[in-house]
Amino acid sequence: MLNNTLFFKQSEIHTISSYANRINDEVKSGDIGYYHLIDTSLNLIDESLQFIQDKEYVKNIVLVGMGGSSCGVKALRDMLFNEKSNQRELFILDNTSSHSFNKTLEKIKLEESLFLIISKTGSTIEVVSLFKLLIEHFKLDMQELKKYFVFITDKDSKLHQEGENLGIKCFFIPANVGGRFSILSAVGIVPLCFCGYNAKALLEGAKACFEDFFTHKKDEILQKAYHYCTHKNANINVLFSYSDAFKGFNEWYIQLIAESLGKKQGYKRIGLTPIALIGARDQHSFLQLIMDGPKNKTVTFLKIKDAQKAPIIPDIHFKFLDSLSNKVNLHELLNAQCDATMHALIAENLSVDVIELEKLDAWHAGYLMYYYELFTSTCGVMLGINTYDQPGVEVGKLILKNILNS
């Protein structure tokens, strides 16, 4: 289970019920497709497993994608490090950095690898460029590409057309699913299945979140979104995640919130600014600013109740060093640090909430990611913006094309 505890004054239900109705209308309209992936993506599991079942030679899955085509998968790879049931390793190329490109290629062999080229539009310049570099690096002929590459894209996109031309297997992203909301589509399901993760449990966790919100009417997401969107002087939300397993999730959270909620509304610029930290490490860097700096931040703590294989700190006594943590489970120490920091911030009258996962597995990862997608959609409704476009990003893309053309 996932528990979300709010340490701030909550609103009367009649104040926020209209926003719940608008989210319901959004679901019923069918215009925003991510809501329905919990059901429609089930068929992808069988299709993915059938495709990969005879490819025993594949030891590496190399995903090439940007933004929404990679952040979510990176989050799942980090969170599900204990869940993998086979030996396929997942590599991710998500930047036009020669350093990371060359470093990744040093670790893989062509004959042991399957490359997933992911671009919703089918024309992402970074993805197309990396695709070409892979062809050149491995000295592949065009007729060989179908053995080593799989495309994930929109139906009838340029990438799909090229896949048809080259005989490359294509998986499709629904047209009404935006990139940063696509983790439960082929973008996430296909690589998870290829690597041996439990994609069905991921969808089941997401569906449980859907039912808690829409059927059981749990209101934590509504309360949290309303509080954070109406506190105009505290428009920075800090996600303080207490486990290194949340490193990729933090990146996904930043992209989801920033690209969805940072918008122009007429002459006004509005939105929540996301900051993501890892505890307990960042207690020794950013915490001072939160505690004593401007009160322009809200803080969400993310923790795991039970962690597997956590060692116990030995009962070793020194003459000068303290023994406070002796015989304490290392994960219990981490959670104690989380709780201590949280209550210190509450004492400073900051708006704080905590999300606690029972454990870290595919089901809980699915619930958590769907929770944040619903939270983002709810904030968008409350802010009166289009949550699902990114006009500011498109401007830079046009300038880049002009630079390259010149």
UniProtKB/Swiss-Prot annotation:
InterPro entries reported in the protein's UniProt record: G6P_Isomerase, Phosphoglucose_isomerase_CS, SIS_dom_sf, SIS_PGI_1, SIS_PGI_2
- Per UniProt, which keywords does this protein have? Cytoplasm, Gluconeogenesis, Glycolysis, Isomerase
Q: Which organism is it from?
A: Campylobacter jejuni subsp. jejuni serotype O:2 (strain ATCC 700819 / NCTC 11168)
Q: What is this protein called?
A: Glucose-6-phosphate isomerase
The main location class comes to cytoplasm
Alphabetized CDD domains for the sequence: SIS_PGI_1, SIS_PGI_2
Q: Which GO terms describe its cellular component?
A: cytosol
Give the record's GO biological process terms.
gluconeogenesis; glucose 6-phosphate metabolic process; glycolytic process
Task: State the EC number(s).
Answer: 5.3.1.9
Q: Does the keyword Isomerase apply?
A: yes
